[in-house]
Amino acid sequence: MKKVAIVGALLVLAGCAEVENYNDVVKTPAPAGLEGYWQSKGPQRKLVSPEAIASLVVTKEGDTLDCRQWQRVIALPGKLTMLSDDLTNVTVKRELYEIERDGNTLEYDGMTLQRVARPTPECAAALEKTPLPTPLPTPLP
């Protein structure tokens, strides 16, 4: 039993935290300037193809949609939380992605995302099919 506790503590300290139950994650409101639509620009090493697009939708209340598209759309709802003082997106599949913002640029899952006016049509369709629990950001003009 002591070994399990020690290993668990080491994983948390090493930044390898794991979420056992998505519903137990405490949602954090989006910090100022993070609410909105974010999208990859150009090829990203973390995506399967140079034509693939990664998008992140963040509501003011901290709900998210991680939307990646290439030959199909994979859209995972999630929520923002603080893990070890780092702002992190936790998806319903319990995947953890740290978020770092610098102006209109995000570092997210090893990718660089830029602020955009609205989601891609494919991600907008995913949002219509499975809406987030809180209101979406207002699209930019």
UniProtKB/Swiss-Prot annotation:
Lipidation (N-palmitoyl cysteine): 16
Matches recorded under Gene3D superfamilies: YedD-like protein
Cited InterPro entries: YedD, YedD-like_sf
Keywords: Cell membrane, Lipoprotein, Membrane, Palmitate, Signal
Compartment list: Cell membrane
Annotated GO CC locations: plasma membrane
Major localisation: membrane
Residues anchoring lipid (S-diacylglycerol cysteine): 16
Coiled-coil intervals: none
Keyword Glycoprotein: no
Signal peptide positions on this chain: 1-15
Protein's membrane topology: Lipid-anchor
UniProt cross-references to Pfam families, sorted A to Z: YedD
Protein name: Uncharacterized lipoprotein YedD
